[in-house]
From Swiss-Prot:
Role, per record: Has a role in meiosis.
Any one of the GO CC terms: cell surface
Originating species: Schizosaccharomyces pombe (strain 972 / ATCC 24843)
Identification of the protein by name: Meiotically up-regulated gene 191 protein
Annotated Gene3D superfamilies: 1.50.10.20
Modified residues (Phosphothreonine): T361
Entry-linked InterPro entries: 6-hairpin_glycosidase_sf, Glyco_hydro_76, MUG_Protein
Superkingdom assignment: Eukaryota
Compositionally skewed regions (Polar residues) per UniProt: 416-429
């Protein structure tokens, strides 16, 4: 049996994150020191970091059941953010009056919970996870969707920008969350409702946020009474939209009759083509040569890895399928070689190594025949006083969890293309009795 190095590493990262960042005495996720994503004197992580970790741990359940009990601990940690007013998670631990509730954060929480519910072998836990995911998606559909302009708002506050911005991240994440939930439910009427909503999200992105190369721009914001396009382009917006479209491709039973659904394959392939253009905005243009690293961090790029992977299996006959898989594997190889922190078994955040240290700047310049100068990033370092470049580098939960999710996408490619690889050659049957073992894309 050949070894799936990506799967082994992804599982190791998930385990190391739990050992490093989970406090079993309080069921909280935090850090021993102030780092990016933590808040207050106890260095507790904001819900975004915990959500990405929940997604990574849920991914692990596809391959092994050994993290099921640990996922239950993460679920308990997420409960500390839960608002009984909104039936969703606050950005930080809930207290009376806390109305800091982001739709994109909650969509990622729902993705993790729905995926875990799909794969867990414990029916009681499954019901708890899926119920919470349903509550979140209900809020998003009923309150997050802008009834006049379409799209999902960034935040539950309705007092104007930036809270009311119609963002690609909130809209695409919500689509994926709805589809992951649809896969975890048995009720065909609920499935149909969720699939229809997800398709509305995808159509809205297609009609409002694409650039000329089918890359997703960041969103719309209201300025002087007019909606203005923010043309910033990040890996996660395009990647998550591709994942949503790939999932829709596998749910044909529920997409029949949806307006313009016949355009879905073209939408998906066009976006994949843009995402693979190494001369485009998703790639670091300081790189020279045929391979360029993504111009982003791990917890954004993980969504592009997943999007390209799911596309390659949703449309396996596309001429872009194999290049998409190669890109996912190449980015994962770079990740493991340069961003891994050997001592902790965790990961830095930035693919731009020149933001980490002078030594890694030199490695980047050598690898890519580049000429970058060291640009220290405070988010890669312990949050303390003093010059940024003198602060110690440190791992973060969100950076490491994002790396794990990138590795799971690479692992899935190896497993499918070489079924003798990896920890599990037969994918686990969902606990609710369905025999669909291709939940990643269908």
């Amino acid at each position: 049996m050949s070894e799936n190095v990506y799967l082994n590493e992804a599982l190791n990262v998930v385990d190391q994150c739990f050992k490093t960042f989970f406090d079993k005495y309080t069921d909280r996720m935090g850090s021993a020191f102030a780092c990016s994503g933590t808040i207050d004197k106890d260095h507790i992580f904001l819900v975004w970091s915990v959500a990405v970790y929940a997604e990574a741990m849920a991914d692990s359940l596809r391959y092994t059941s050994k993290f099921e009990r640990k996922f239950e601990h993460v679920f308990q940690a997420l409960k500390k953010y839960w608002s009984p007013v909104f039936n969703a998670c606050c950005a930080f631990h809930y207290f009376e009056g806390n109305d800091d509730v982001y739709y994109d954060d909650n969509a990622q929480v729902a993705i993790g919970l729905a995926t875990a519910g799909y794969y867990t072998t414990n029916s009681s836990r499954r019901d708890h996870y899926v119920s919470r995911a349903e509550s979140i998606i209900s809020l998003i559909i009923n309150k997050g969707w802008n009834q006049q302009r379409g799209g999902i708002a960034w935040h539950t506050r309705t007092t104007g920008p930036p809270w009311t911005n119609l963002n690609a991240c909130s809209t695409s994440m919500s689509a994926v969350a709805a589809l992951r939930l649809a896969l975890a439910l048995d009720d065909p009427n609920k499935k149909q409702h969720l699939v229809s909503f997800a398709w509305n999200c995808v159509r809205w992105i297609q009609e409002n946020l694409l650039d000329e190369n089918h890359i997703v721009c960041d969103g719309l914001s209201l300025k002087d009474g007019k909606w203005v396009l923010d043309k910033a382009r990040f890996t996660y917006n395009t990647g998550t939209t591709m994942t949503a479209m790939s999932l829709l491709m596998g749910l044909g039973e529920f997409t029949k009759g949806l307006q313009d659904i016949e355009k879905l394959p073209t939408y998906l392939e066009d976006m994949a083509r843009g995402a693979l253009d190494t001369n485009g905005p998703l790639y670091d243009q300081s790189c020279n040569g045929s391979f360029k690293v993504w111009s982003d961090n791990t917890f954004f790029a993980q969504h592009l890895s997943e999007g390209l992977m799911t596309f390659s299996y949703a449309m396996p006959s596309s001429a872009l399928a194999k290049p998409a898989q190669k890109m996912v594997l190449d980015q994962a190889d770079f990740l493991m070689k340069y961003l891994r922190i050997p001592k902790e078994g965790l990961y830095y955040r930035n693919f731009g190594l020149y933001k980490l240290s002078p030594e890694l700047t030199a490695s980047f310049n050598k690898f890519f025949n580049a000429n970058k100068q060291f640009q220290p990033d405070k988010d890669e370092r312990i949050q303390q006083e003093g010059p940024v470049e003198q602060r110690p580098l440190c791992p973060t939960l969100i950076g490491s969890a994002g790396a794990a999710r990138m590795l799971f996408s690479a692992a899935e490619i190896v497993n499918r293309n070489n079924p003798s690889s990896g920890e599990s050659t037969t994918l686990p049957q969902p606990s609710h009795g369905k025999k669909d073992k291709d939940c990643v894309i269908s």
